[in-house]
C-alpha cells in the first residue's frame, strides 16, 4: 500500500508565497519534499524558489541494498520573451548506498557515499490560451541537468510537448509526448536513484515502478523513457452534472 499526504498554500502569510510540503510512504520507500516559492521576488517579476528533498529506499530484505538521499535546490524562473520562460537552478545531494551479501554485483559496485551537484536549465514555450481547462494551442518545454560534481557524470534531458484542442462544445482533447534520458558522459553505470521510471500518470492502469529493465527480479528503471498520451473528455455523458467528468484516454510507453 502507498500513502500520500501533503499541504499546499499559494498565499502564505498573505505575502504571495507558495509553500508546499508532501510525503509518500510505502513498504519500501519514503519520499518527502518541502518547497517555498516567491513568484515575484523583490518586485522583479522573477520567481525564486527553494526545494528541500529527502528519500529513503529500503530493499535490504528483498534485494540487499538500501539508499538514503537528502538535498537542496535553489532556482529562478522568469519570462524571457512573450510566452517564453527560462529557468536556472543549482542543486546538491548527499546519498549513501548500503549493500549486503545478497545484493547483485551491479548494486555492490555502487555501494558508498556520493556528493552530487548539478546545474539545471529549462526552456518553456507556453502558447496555451489558459492554464485551467486549456482548449487551444500547445506547450513545449525542455529541461537539461548538467553534472558539475559527480562520480557518475550523469547527464539528464527531458522534453514534454502538449497539444490541446476543443473538438466540439465543452470538449477538451489533449495529445502529449514525453521523452527523458539519463546517461553518463564518462560511460559509467548511473546510480539507481538516477535511473528513470515512467510516471504513473503517463501509464495509467499499471503499477508505478514495475515496468522496464530488471536486475534479477528487481525493477531498476532505464536510461531512456518515452510515452505517448491521448485523452478526450466526454461532456455529453451526464452533461448536467457539475461534479462528474468522463474521460477517454490511451497511454503507450517504453523504458
Give the label of every model feature segment:
Residues 1-2, 21-32, 58-67, 146-155, ...:
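Solvent-exposed loop/turn segments connecting transmembrane beta-strands
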Residues 11-19, 41-48, 80-87, 129-132, ...:
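Repeated loop/turn-to-beta-strand initiation elements of outer-membrane beta-barrel proteins
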Residues 28, 57, 95, 204, ...:
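A short acidic, often aromatic-flanked loop/helix-cap motif at beta-alpha or helix-coil junctions
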Residues 6-10, 22-26, 35-39, 51-57, ...:
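Outer-membrane beta-barrel pore domains and translocons
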Residues 32-111:
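Transmembrane beta-barrel wall of Gram-negative outer-membrane proteins
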Residues 3-11, 30-43, 48-50, 68-80, ...:
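Feature captures outer-membrane beta-barrel proteins of Gram-negative bacteria and organelles
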Residues 1, 102-244, 248-252:
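C-terminal outer-membrane beta-barrel translocator/porin domains of Gram-negative envelope proteins
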Residues 25, 63, 77-78, 112, ...:
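Generic alpha-helical structural element
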Amino acid at each position: 500500500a502507498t500513502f500520500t499526504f501533503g499541504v499546499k498554500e499559494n498565499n502564505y502569510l498573505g505575502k504571495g508565497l507558495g509553500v508546499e510540503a508532501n510525503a509518500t510512504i510505502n513498504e519500501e520507500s519514503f519520499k518527502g519534499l518541502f518547497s517555498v516559492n516567491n513568484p515575484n521576488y523583490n518586485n522583479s517579476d522573477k520567481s525564486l524558489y527553494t526545494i528541500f528533498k529527502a528519500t529513503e529506499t529500503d530493499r535490504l530484505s528483498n534485494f540487499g541494498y538500501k539508499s538514503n538521499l537528502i538535498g537542496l535546490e535553489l532556482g529562478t524562473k522568469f519570462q524571457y520573451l512573450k510566452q517564453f520562460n527560462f529557468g536556472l537552478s543549482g542543486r546538491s545531494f548527499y546519498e549513501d548506498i548500503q549493500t549486503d551479501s545478497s545484493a547483485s554485483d551491479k548494486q555492490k559496485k555502487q555501494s558508498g557515499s556520493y556528493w552530487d551537484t548539478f546545474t539545471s536549465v529549462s526552456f518553456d514555450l507556453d502558447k496555451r490560451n489558459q492554464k485551467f481547462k486549456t482548449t487551444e494551442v500547445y506547450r513545449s518545454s525542455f529541461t537539461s541537468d548538467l553534472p558539475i560534481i559527480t562520480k557518475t557524470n550523469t547527464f539528464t534531458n527531458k522534453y514534454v510537448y502538449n497539444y490541446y484542442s476543443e473538438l466540439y462544445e465543452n470538449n477538451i482533447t489533449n495529445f502529449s509526448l514525453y521523452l527523458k534520458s539519463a546517461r553518463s558522459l564518462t560511460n559509467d553505470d548511473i546510480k539507481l536513484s538516477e535511473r528513470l521510471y515512467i510516471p504513473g500518470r503517463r501509464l495509467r492502469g499499471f503499477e508505478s515502478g514495475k515496468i522496464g529493465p530488471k536486475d534479477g527480479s528487481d525493477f531498476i528503471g532505464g536510461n531512456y523513457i518515452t510515452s505517448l498520451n491521448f485523452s478526450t473528455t466526454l461532456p455529453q455523458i451526464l452533461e448536467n452534472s457539475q461534479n462528474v467528468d468522463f474521460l477517454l484516454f490511451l497511454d503507450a510507453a517504453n523504458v
